Amino acid sequence: MHSPKSFLLLAVVFVALRVTAAPLWNAKNPEQLQYIAARCMEEWSPKAKDPKAALKNWMEWKLQPSNEEATQCYTKCMLENIGYYEPGEKRLKGVRVMQQWETFNRYQSADRNKVHDLTDTFDFIKPLKSSSCSDVFNAYKDVHAKHLETIKAILFCDGKSAEKYYKDKGKNVKQKGESIFVHCEEIHYPVGSPQRNELCKVRKYELGTGKPFENLMECIFKGVRYFNDKNELNIDEIARDFTQVGKKPDAVKAAMENCKSKTKETDPGKKAVEYYKCLLADSKVKKDFMEAFDYREIRSKDYYAQITGKLKPYSASDVRKEVNDIDSNKCV
């Protein structure tokens, strides 16, 4: 017969194995949620039969038209990127619903009991047969209809919760209408700091020095998602920025694959600087990268600008003028 101590040890080992096996996940703040929603809409609305109608529905939290692949895949995109659907397990993750609420409930209006109900509903759904858009959508659609008020609340779409969050966090998070670049500069090159004198040349694609520059590049690379959650280089995201300005991404993909294979750095800041140097050192890439990076700065002010029609058709001269205006404010 096992002793109580041995049962306790087995229980601890079992829990440890479960924790180790489970993918790491962090609750999502308003900036992250807006980024996810905008990207999923950008990806799937063009594939709808009526893109404008689909976008209008999705922005109003209506998963319609429900029989279209675009809506089903948009739904899966949202659930998977937020982390409420885990493809490795083929199931909805109730524990993450609770973690989201526990992390941010001081800002939100969600009722605790209703959050528990939503958590239980997720957990009672058995693992799916596949991670296809239709299977994920069909597993989730009734949950969405029944618990929409709670879902919106824990995802900062309940009125003023996002506003409370942004006010509380201040300059520590990217504010609405602020570019990722300016946000990172204000943290790592603040007014009055010794490194502030370097900011003007840094904004003109010259390399900065020391830890402040490493911190700045890490912040920007994370903000524009050139780094993923594990601080690994996301070459597809860099390539996407090239296509946004009408440039072929083949050269930059090859250059960054080569750079990635040679980089030995593990510190995220030093690694970001190494990758940035690679982008500026390759004569086949540098000019197009600078153009793409400028445009990314402008687009990072408003994640919804492209899908709402607020983003003007791309013009290199117009973007350069906007960036020059920002430079003029920073170089004083």
Swiss-Prot record:
SMART domains assigned: PhBP
Cystine connections: 40-77, 73-133, 184-219, 200-331, 259-278
UniProt xrefs under Gene3D superfamilies: Pheromone/general odorant binding protein domain
Presence of the UniProt keyword ATP-binding in the record: no
CDD domains the record matches: PBP_GOBP
Amino-acid positions noted as binding noradrenaline in the UniProt annotation, renumbered to this chain: 185, 203, 294, 297
GO cellular component, one term: extracellular space
Tissue distribution: Female mosquito salivary gland (at protein level).
Record keywords: Disulfide bond, Hemostasis impairing toxin, Platelet aggregation inhibiting toxin, Secreted, Signal, Toxin
Signal peptide: 1-21
Biological processes annotated in GO: sensory perception of smell
Residues holding leukotriene E4: 61, 176
Molecular function per GO: odorant binding; toxin activity
Compartments in which it is found: Secreted
UniProt-listed Pfam families: PBP_GOBP (PF01395)
Domain notes: Lipids and biogenic amines bind independently through different binding pockets, with lipids binding to the N-terminal pocket and biogenic amines to the C-terminal pocket.
Family recorded in the similarity comment: Belongs to the PBP/GOBP family.
Miscellaneous comment text of the record: Antibodies against the protein are found in the serum of individuals exposed to Aedes albopictus bites.
Role, per record: Modulates blood feeding of female mosquitoes on vertebrate species by binding and sequestering different mediators involved in the host response, such as biogenic amines and eicosanoids. Binds dopamine, serotonin, histamine, tryptamine, adrenaline, noradrenaline, leukotriene B4, leukotriene C4, leukotriene D4, leukotriene E4 and U-46619, a stable analog of thromboxane A2. Inhibits platelet aggregation induced by serotonin and low doses of thromboxane A2 analog U-46619 but not by high doses of U-46619, collagen or ADP. Prevents leukocyte recruitment.
Protein's name according to its UniProt entry: Long form salivary protein D7L1
Highest classification ranks of the organism: Eukaryota, Metazoa, Ecdysozoa, Arthropoda, Hexapoda
